[in-house]
């Protein structure tokens, strides 16, 4: 945001120097990024009268001018074409240093001596562009400093505003802050507005079809204007803040934008079909050509201003080429409105179309400024372009904003800031920036009820008001103190501690954590081959998605992790151990808010070990992933788990997957990803995946085990081999073994599985090793054999096992 010293003084009669003002603004939170002293060091640029203008004898595009600047008459060679004898111009005499460190020297141009330079506005730093040299009023006496004669000596401040301060995107907003700093009154100059006899409502109408996106829309009709160049004062004002002059009507709207901070738009009334305005959403794929002559494809989320036939402006962003004010325009319809910040930001971002108007609307304009800005603009247009303002303003206001009140306790202000401010001090600070304050004295507590004005959308809570008090009282006035109170160490919540524990287990197992967006494309579930009635196909939709590919909340971590595999494999990184531990979001029929559930998803693919001369090229398989799951279960002390040799998940291979259960509760699924799913993700190698319900895991977890000393007595092992039916999983065998063992059994390990020669069809041979140990004695062979026989009998009785 750019403001100038002189423009601020039109609103506040302050006495601060330019440097002091810059310091005070910065300390008030409006950081001054740069200062530019307009006209500084240019006192030697003086008014001069052209005595004669002759063609250069050796150059068709140059002229030789005799210039009278009061003290003397000098010869200057000039390349401009817009001057003649008798004109008063700006002469930079020899020795002058112009902006850009350009020093004027005596020179010889095509054989003709030149003692200075006739300057344009651009060369003097007064404009971004210019068509010729600067022609001044013929009444100016030669020899006077140009910047003094025109009153152009000024200081330009460029402010680095934070997004939460839209109120300071105007000269008025910054002046309000200056008024609060120096305790001077704020003077808002609103010129009188004269109206004609014709009624505005008889000639036009305004219809708002979407009050959510456009809570307020006002319009005035001005007839008989003459579009042309703006007067010098208006051009200078705009150029001082970096704006280019277009024509008198458009310049007035830009002037109001910069001074009051409210965007306006002028339509050519005669080019509006049926002479009326309709505010509504655009049609999908609707084509619209904006003022920059670019045809843009609109969406249903875009708000447009229409006439009786179609769109004439992209609301809050840019006008349309089909209704712009041109030299032939006679009647104009002037728009002043308030648009939903989110809607404007979404449209501006999607179309990559930024403007001064969208910059203000998307941060939050002042809805109360709508009629004020409109009336002042109408009065100025009549002043600079003529015409008559039709009687009455159309002001459609279907959705007034609710009044916002915040209660602030004096004690809370002082506790946070370490000050001893009284109620009157705090009240004075808040009143100085335009807030309404009502003191409320209660028993032992002084409070202020503060009504927040519409130009401060950033003030929502009492802590925001505390910040305002600190800012206005002066950060320099906050005393330096040592921290008060006790230093307390707060443990993180239990849930976060458990999350960290699981992360540590995965990292210790050699996995790398990934973090993906919680937003995915609606088509993500198709690639997982989910059934049509799967509840994960009903995701929570985002109201304002950044893109269509991130328009719904994810109901599973699987698509995101498989996309990580796809990207890594594409970069020749195919040996992967990845996991993600994050929430998913499921819809709930009885509640507006979705259900948030934490899940763990992990993938394995490629080589088991990193490449090296001592390592082999063995690939990971299902049992590598199963081992990781066993580490998780052991870390969380989850007991009595079964491995169901089937999975209902369509994204897993039906013959190479299983479901992890504790009794009837499903803890998760794991297995090889289905080939169809791998093909959908462009993955050409086997991938093993774990999808674990973290919350069910915590519910199944046992307490932390107590300390158990190692036995100092020897261990004895017994091996047994037996035949069982092929379809009996080891989890069922393990359950029988666990039930039949006594206190002497320390461990049971399956160390061999055999199918083939000598084994009947439909059978498999399993070999187990049982280790026995006592804590208080050396075991005798009779004790060990008795315990081992009990295990063998249980296998025969429960599973029909045949001992080999």
From Swiss-Prot:
UniProt xrefs under Pfam families: B3_4, B5, FDX-ACB, tRNA_bind, tRNA_synthFbeta
Residues in B5 domain copies: 401-480
tRNA-binding domain residues: 39-147
GO CC, alphabetical: phenylalanine-tRNA ligase complex
Record-listed Mg(2+) binding positions: 458, 464, 467-468
Residues of the FDX-ACB domain: 711-804
Catalytic activity: tRNA(Phe) + L-phenylalanine + ATP = L-phenylalanyl-tRNA(Phe) + AMP + diphosphate + H(+)
Name under which the protein is recorded: Phenylalanine--tRNA ligase beta subunit
Organism: Syntrophotalea carbinolica (strain DSM 2380 / NBRC 103641 / GraBd1)
